[in-house]
A protein has these predicted regions:
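Conserved micro-motifs of the catalytic ATP-binding
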Residues: 3-8
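Short helix N-cap motif at coil->helix boundaries in the Bergerat
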Residues: 55-66
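Short beta-strand/loop element within the Bergerat-fold HATPase_c
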Residues: 31-43
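Conserved glycine-rich
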Residues: 97-98
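Short helix-loop "hinge" at the ATP-lid/N-box region of the Bergerat-fold HATPase_c
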Residues: 24-25
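Acidic ATP/Mg2+-coordinating residue in the GHKL
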Residues: 51
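A residue-level detector for a conserved hydrophobic packing site
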Residues: 13-14
């Protein structure tokens, strides 16, 4: 397998990874796991950060990337954070003319996926 290059600002993409992985650690199970998966698509690379944490109810998914939105404000206070992380992630990915998505199941976990253009 040869490397696949993407067109991206490495510092901003590092921030995307840090935010997504931190969320997985923050809301994951004590003995849980995090998977980072890479898929070679036609013109893009799809990258997924998946955990086996608490999951997110469907009613919250459409608002997750809003500034200051928190699924459970009381839990967020215990875990720390500002409610800006996912909004920043979305902004960075969209600044690269790409997309981010989320799917989640309660008590099973969440998967955040984003694309980057291959270069």
């Amino acid at each position: 397998d040869s490397p696949i290059w993407v067109l991206a600002d490495k510092n901003r993409i590092r921030q995307v990874f840090v935010n997504l992985i931190n969320n997985s650690l923050k809301y994951g199970k004590e003995e849980g796991s995090i998977e980072i998966r890479f898929y070679d698509l036609d013109k893009n690379m799809l990258i997924e950060v998946a955990d086996d944490g608490i999951g997110i109810e469907n009613k919250h998914l459409s608002r997750l990337f809003e500034r200051f939105y928190r699924v459970d404000a009381s839990r967020s206070r215990d875990k720390g954070g500002t409610g800006l992380g996912l909004s920043i992630v979305k902004h960075i990915i969209e600044a690269h003319d790409q997309t981010i998505s989320v799917r989640s199941t309660i008590k099973v976990g969440s998967t955040f996926g984003f694309t980057l253009k291959k270069g």
